Curated annotation (Swiss-Prot):
One Pfam family recorded for the sequence: ATP-synt
Family matches, as Gene3D superfamilies: 3.40.1380.10, ATP synthase, gamma subunit, helix hairpin domain
Annotated protein name in UniProt: ATP synthase gamma chain
Gene: atpG
Annotated source species: Nitrobacter hamburgensis (strain DSM 10229 / NCIMB 13809 / X14)
Classification via InterPro entries: ATP_synth_F1_ATPase_gsu (IPR035968), ATP_synth_F1_gsu (IPR000131), ATP_synth_F1_gsu_CS (IPR023632)
Keywords: ATP synthesis, Cell inner membrane, Cell membrane, CF(1), Hydrogen ion transport, Ion transport, Membrane, Transport
Subunit structure: F-type ATPases have 2 components, CF(1) - the catalytic core - and CF(0) - the membrane proton channel. CF(1) has five subunits: alpha(3), beta(3), gamma(1), delta(1), epsilon(1). CF(0) has three main subunits: a, b and c.
Length: 292
């Protein structure tokens, strides 16, 4: 049995851990508000831009001058999985849920005879994926030194992806990230970004409105598609940022509660042990007095 001193040390250690987890919970809560506002503000712009480009793409469908980013290479043999995760842990299942979705997609594609490559954004995703797919990871971008996410960070990633696409390294690119829903709910999401997925009009939608574009649709798409790619990546990074702080806040709250339960149990054991030792000493004193 542990001595009373060991028990006191253990209780003090648990209390110190509880203070740390409580502080981390409060920091995550304060950062979550700003991150959530940024993610929610980026959604309408990203969704509307995707919709506008989809409308223009529908008008340019079949055009011989359509950008390759729109129609793709015409093949789907080589898939690039752009996996965006966090730089830090202590956030529950935030990182592992994104990696799990990407891993499941990779295995499904490989079972179909496809070639799979990984482009990792974030240290945690890279560390998990390299255990299984180290030879298939073509690039890893870390944002550890970035104090505040900006569009320039997403634009740099988009340029790297486009450069690899233009070099013929892949046919299809899918973006993986965690969509922020609430503090306790983050949804792992997969979104195809190359080639652009154009939604077919509904059967009962009626005649589509006619638009004239100036300049021509192909020229507009040539300019907007790289921009849209950066916008979608930026949105994913902002969603991830909010999801990370939401998951961390929830995880640290659970850790703080668990530490409180441990402290109560340890204190109960300590008090019972101390009481038993005092009772034993009293019995020994009384027995000695009676013997005299």
């Amino acid at each position: 049995m542990a001595s009373l001193k060991d028990m006191r040390v253990r209780i003090a250690s648990t209390k110190a851990t509880q203070k740390i987890t409580k502080a981390m919970q409060m920091v995550a809560a304060s950062k979550l508000r700003r991150a959530q506002s940024a993610a929610e503000a980026a959604r309408p712009y990203a969704e509307k831009m995707d919709q506008v480009i989809s409308n223009i793409a529908s008008a340019a469908a079949g055009s011989p001058g359509a950008p390759v980013l729109l129609g793709g290479t015409g093949k789907d043999q080589v898939h690039l999985l752009l996996v965006c995760t966090g730089e830090r842990g202590l956030s529950g299942a935030f990182n592992s849920s994104i990696v799990r979705l990407a891993r499941e997609r990779a295995l499904a594609l490989m079972n179909q005879g496809k070639d799979v490559k990984f482009f990792c954004v974030g240290r945690k995703g890279y560390e998990q994926l390299r255990r299984t797919f180290e030879k298939q990871i073509v690039e890893n971008v870390e944002l550890r030194s970035v104090r505040q996410l900006g569009f320039v960070n997403a634009e740099a990633i988009a340029k790297k992806v486009i450069a690899r696409f233009n070099a013929g390294e892949f046919d299809v690119c899918t973006l993986f990230y965690s969509r922020f829903k609430s503090v306790i709910a983050q949804v792992p999401t997969a979104q195809q970004i190359i080639p652009l997925e154009v939604e077919a009009p509904a059967a009962n939608a009626g005649p589509a409105p006619f638009y004239e574009y100036e300049p021509e649709e192909d020229e507009i798409l040539t300019r907007l598609l790289p921009r849209n790619l950066a916008v979608q990546i930026f949105r994913a990074l902002l969603e991830n940022n909010a999801s990370f702080y939401g998951a961390q806040m929830s995880a640290m709250d659970n850790a703080t509660r668990n530490a409180g339960d441990m402290i109560r149990k340890q204190t109960l054991v300590y008090n019972r042990t101390r009481q038993a030792m005092i009772t034993k000493e009293l019995i020994e004193i009384i027995s000695g007095a009676e013997a005299i």
